[in-house]
Structures are given as C-alpha cells and as structure tokens.
From Swiss-Prot:
Organism in which the protein naturally occurs: Mycobacterium avium (strain 104)
Domain of life: Bacteria
GO cellular component annotations of the record: cytoplasm
The record's free-text note on cofactor binding: Binds 2 [4Fe-4S] clusters per subunit. One cluster is coordinated with 3 cysteines and an exchangeable S-adenosyl-L-methionine.
Protein name: Lipoyl synthase
Amino acid sequence: MTVAPEGRKLLRLEVRNADTPIERKPPWIRVRARMGPEYTELKSLVRREGLHTVCEEAGCPNIFECWEDREATFLIGGDQCTRRCDFCQIDTGKPAELDRDEPRRVADSVRTMGLRYATVTGVARDDLPDGGAWLYAETVRAIKELNPSTGVELLIPDFNGRPDRLAEVFGSRPEVLAHNVETVPRIFKRIRPAFTYRRSLDVLTAAREAGLVTKSNLILGLGETPDEVRTALADLRGAGCDIITITQYLRPSARHHPVERWVKPEEFVEFARHAEELGFSGVLAGPLVRSSYRAGRLYRQAARARA
C-alpha cells in the first residue's frame, strides 16, 4: 500500500501503521440491531429525501438507539480535513470551497427528520481565514431558527485557540459545546500532531466561562495506561468539562494507528465510576459508546445538575 484512497501518497507514519494487520475484535465488540418504529420511519425518510448523516455514512454502531430517540449527527465543512489524527477515518487533503448554503440544508434536514436533538461536527478548515468559525456558528443559528425546539450539540476543532473564532462559535449558543481531547498527554502529539493537549483543555475552559455546557471524549486503546486515563479525566474536570464519554478505539483501516489494547467492559465501568466521583454531571463509558451517543439524554442530565 503506497497510495491513500483519496489519491495522495501515504505518509511514512501510515506506511509504518500498515505493517500491523487489522486486529480481530474481541467477542464483546458486537452490535444487536434493534429496529424500533422510530428508527424504521427515520431510515425510510432519510432514503426518500436523500439526506446525509454521519450516523449512516460512518456506520455508527449506535444508529438504532439514537434514531429511535430521534437524534442524529451531521458533518459540515466537506469531506477533506486540513489536519490528520491517527485514529480518524476522515481524509486529509485540500478541502473544497466553502459551501455557504450548507447551514440551511442541515437545518432543513433536521426539520425533515423531526429530530429532537442534533449533533453537528465537522472537519478542521485551517484553509479559511476564520478557520471555519462562521460555518460552525451559522449552522447552529440556522438549526435553531428553523427548529426552535430541537437541542443542538456542536463538536468543534480548536480553531487554534483564537479567542475571536471561539467567541463567534460560542455566540451561537448551542445546548452543548463539545471539544474532544481524545487521548492522554504522553501520546497526544503522536496521535493528534496538529493539536495540543493544553490548548484543547483551554478551549473547554473558555466555553465553560462563556456559560455553555461542555463535553469531551477519551478514546482508549491507543497506548495509554489506566493511570493516565484517570489523570486525563481529572484534567478535563479541572478545565470545566461537564460531560465525558469514554470509548474503545476501532481502527478504520490498516493505515491508521494499530489497536494497542482491547479494554474490557468492566474497566469501562470503573472509569465511569471514577469520572462520576470527580464530579462530571454526565458520563457514558463503554466499548461501543461514541461521543454523540445518547447526546440528548446526557445534555438533559447535565442541565439538571446545573439547575
């Protein structure tokens, strides 16, 4: 393998990753498809209307439960990211020109799907003068204008920590402002070379100071130790993070970081208990948990804790 699917030459890191075959999943990494009436109706509607969600396109294992709750996730900014994280399946490259009509289309999709809660995430757009801040903020504004009763969670990149860009995004007032730290300090640069651990914590602190409910995610199985996970949880809580999800890394392809360890379900239970003891108001941890899983429920839980 010398060329990535998007046509670019593989990075040396990707070539090295590809030397390790794709790992066999343990027996507890299994999904049961429970297709309830809300899920069935939503799937039919999405097909009929030609709508696009991260839930389907990324093959999320939790789609059955989330759609049954009328929750879905949308990806904005295109399908090419200006940064590369070693766990992420989104392609790295030169993004297409900014699509200024995208916020309206996402808002229309939210209305057509009758969503109670929508998560919006996107690619990093370091090619744009504002890093994509307007696009993220405008998508929230468009959803809220067209769907005033729908909760919105916004999962953002770090916008290089620029206060003006963060202020633009925070001003759109999503119900939850999420920024995922993803891993622990020791291996952070190896996994997320275009981000910094400290800056990610600072983004969460700034969002909390702006009066927003804050959320982050940790991916396990990238080479961290249990003690490092506990330290990262304490760092996140200290930074003002309200909600935490803890997940198992599943390798998207051979060119991505190998799975270092399959974390057992009982370990996730222990990490969740530790997070609750630290004072997080919303906690979900498990092998198949993803950062937008049960997002609406976690928000309501955190909002009640604040009241």
